[in-house]
Curated annotation (Swiss-Prot):
CDD domains documented for this protein: Rieske_cytochrome_b6f
Any one GO BP annotation for this protein: photosynthesis
Catalytic activity: 2 oxidized [plastocyanin] + a plastoquinol + 2 H(+)(in) = 2 reduced [plastocyanin] + a plastoquinone + 4 H(+)(out)
Protein name per the record: Cytochrome b6-f complex iron-sulfur subunit
Record gene name: petC
Subunit text: The 4 large subunits of the cytochrome b6-f complex are cytochrome b6, subunit IV (17 kDa polypeptide, PetD), cytochrome f and the Rieske protein, while the 4 small subunits are PetG, PetL, PetM and PetN. The complex functions as a dimer.
Organism from which the protein derives: Prochlorococcus marinus (strain MIT 9515)
Membership in a protein family: Belongs to the Rieske iron-sulfur protein family.
Amino acid sequence: MTQLSSNDVPSMGRRQFMNLLTFGTATGVALGALYPVANYFMPLRAGGGGGGTSAKDELGNPVTKTGWLANHQAGDRSLVQGLKGDPTYLIVNSEGDIGEFGLNAICTHLGCVVPWDSGANKFICPCHGSQYDTNGKVVRGPAPLSLALAHVDVDDDAVLVKQWSETDFRTNENPWWA
C-alpha cells in the first residue's frame, strides 16, 4: 500500500479551524434551544403501560386510587394536574369510585380556571360568569363550548389521565379539543 507524504495531506489552517469551531458551537446552541421546543410538542409520557399521564396532586405527587378515595366522598370534584399539566377535575361518582372521565378546568371563554361550586352543584367561572353542569356541559355563556373531557383510568392503583378523542357524550358531536 502506498503511503501519502506529509505534503499530499491537506492541513487545516487557522481560518478553517476557527470556522469549524464557530459552526460547531452554533450547532450545539441551536440543538440545545430546540430540545425544549421538541419536548413541548412531543412530551414524555408518565404513567403505566396504557400510555396515560399520571395524575398529580397539588404537590406534584402521583395520585393513587386508594389515597384519593380515602379523602374524597361521592359527588366530589377535585383538581389534579392532568394532561399537559392542565388542571383537571377528578370526579368521585355516586358509587364512591373514581369516574371514568375527568374535566379540564380551563374555561372555554378566556382560559380562567373554573371552580366547582358544590352549593350550586355546578362549575361557575369567576371571570365572566360562565356556568357548566356536573358533567362540564356549558349551560350559560359567554363560554362557547363545554369543558374538555379526558379519560380517567386506574392501573395498579395509579390514576392515569388520557386524551379523549371519541364522541362527546354530552353533545353527541366530535370533541372540539381533539
